[in-house]
């Protein structure tokens, strides 16, 4: 087996998802993943720290896509526009990088394993904190930035769940826009109120 086989990273991902679905995450070994992908275990560890990271590799890059959209938005953009820009960029990156079928298969594996669910929640919390910091860096008050960060992650998570639902054909970006429209309707305003009051809790 070649140590640096072309497309090894993608083959390892696909092999892992297949085996997780067939045997369960806990019962699947790195050796089995490598064997199905046609590479050595050493090659596996060149790409991933462990089998869990097959499911979570790339989260830092995705987080950076979200935050870069905030930092590069027009100087006079209101906080509501920064939220929309982050969601647009992050949602498009996710759906273009892996696609709906991969996302569905990955979600099924995570849903079946409590530890993986906890890891996914930590990832989303980290994204919220990163967005909050990016909003503050753009001049938003701390409380408004924190609420906006949590709102963005909530809209993203809700849209993602709809995107991978059986029979859904709309793209993730469109579903995120739907979510933002619902938020605007619920609050009866399209703008974000900012305050200099300190964050509590």
Tell what function each PLM region has:
Residues 1-23, 27-39:
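Basic, helix-initiating cap at the start of DNA-binding domains
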Residues 136, 168-201:
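C-terminal peripheral helix-coil segments that are non-catalytic and often amphipathic
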Residues 124-149:
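Hydrophobic alpha-helical bundle segments that form small-molecule/ligand-binding pockets
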Residues 64-106:
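Hydrophobic alpha-helical connector segments
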Residues 12-20, 66, 83, 120:
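Short hydrophobic clusters on alpha-helical segments that form packing/core surfaces
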Residues 149-169, 185-190:
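Amphipathic C-terminal alpha-helical segment
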Residues 23-25, 38, 45-57, 61:
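HTH DNA-binding helix-turn interface
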Residues 30, 59-67:
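Short, basic, alpha-helical segments at the C-terminal edge of helix-turn-helix-like DNA-binding modules
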């Amino acid at each position: 087996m070649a140590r640096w086989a072309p497309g090894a990273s993608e083959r390892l991902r696909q092999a892992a998802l297949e085996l997780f679905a067939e045997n369960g995450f806990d019962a699947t070994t790195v050796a089995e993943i490598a064997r199905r992908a046609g590479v050595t275990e050493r090659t596996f560890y060149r790409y991933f720290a462990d089998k869990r990271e097959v499911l979570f590799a790339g989260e830092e890059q995705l987080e950076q896509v979200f935050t870069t959209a905030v930092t590069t938005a027009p100087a006079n953009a209101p906080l509501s526009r920064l939220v929309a820009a982050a969601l647009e960029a992050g949602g498009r990156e996710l759906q273009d990088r892996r696609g709906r079928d991969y996302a569905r298969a990955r979600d099924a594996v995570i849903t079946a394993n409590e530890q993986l669910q906890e890891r996914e929640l930590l990832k989303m919390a980290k994204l919220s904190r990163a967005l909050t910091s990016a909003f503050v860096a753009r001049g938003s008050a701390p409380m408004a930035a924190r609420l906006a960060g949590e709102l963005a992650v909530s809209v993203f998570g809700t849209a993602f769940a709809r995107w991978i639902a059986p029979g859904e054909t709309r793209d993730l970006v469109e579903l995120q826009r739907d979510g933002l429209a619902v938020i605007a309707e619920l609050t009866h305003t399209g703008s974000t109120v900012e305050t200099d009051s300190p964050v509590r809790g």
